[in-house]
Amino acid sequence: MKKEIRLEFDAISENEGLARVVVAAFLTQLDPTLEEVQDVKTAVSEAVTNAIVHGYEEHGGRIILEASLENGILEVVITDKGVGIEDVERAMQPMFTTRADSERSGMGFAFMEAFMDRVQVTSSPGEGTSVHMWKAFKGAVLMLSLIHISEPTRPERI
């Protein structure tokens, strides 16, 4: 049986912790290891932070967090209706940042990819971005390869 949650919240840095805790609590149904929980929390933190800093350029907006559990697979989707990403493939390169003047390292997508089994980013300039992340638990790795991912409207990296 598929289990789902959805949370919409203000795109402010204080809510990054809320998103992490909500997904971690939801994930406990799979009896994950502490390391698995930390991995997912880190990926969620990076996706939410990207939405706040880059999607809305820290001017506020709304973020939608959706998560589902089915057959031992966690899917997390973080969506913003911000400025969007002009070149997703380039943005996903380690060390690439649009905020070179700040302390941002350009490693957000690299961390998401390191801690989750699969990451897909879809974006349209002026319309926003969705970051889809999957992680398989307890023998569900084979199932993960069977997940159908619809064709994005923009370049993707999986």
Where are these regions (language model features)?
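Conserved short strand/loop->alpha-helix "switch" segment adjacent to the catalytic nucleotide/phosphoryl-transfer site
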Residues: R20-S45
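A conserved short beta-strand within the histidine kinase catalytic ATPase domain
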Residues: G61-A67
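Short beta-strand-loop-beta element adjacent to the nucleotide/active-site pocket used for signaling
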Residues: S68-V76
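Glycine-rich/acidic phosphate-handling loop/turn and adjacent ATP-lid/helix
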Residues: T79-E103
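Glycine-rich phosphate-binding loop
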Residues: D101-M116
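A short beta-strand-to-loop motif within the catalytic HATPase_c
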Residues: V121-P125
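Glycine-rich GHKL/ HATPase_c ATP-binding element in histidine kinases
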Residues: E127-V131
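Single conserved hydrophobic/aromatic residue that forms the stacking wall/gate
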Residues: I147-I158
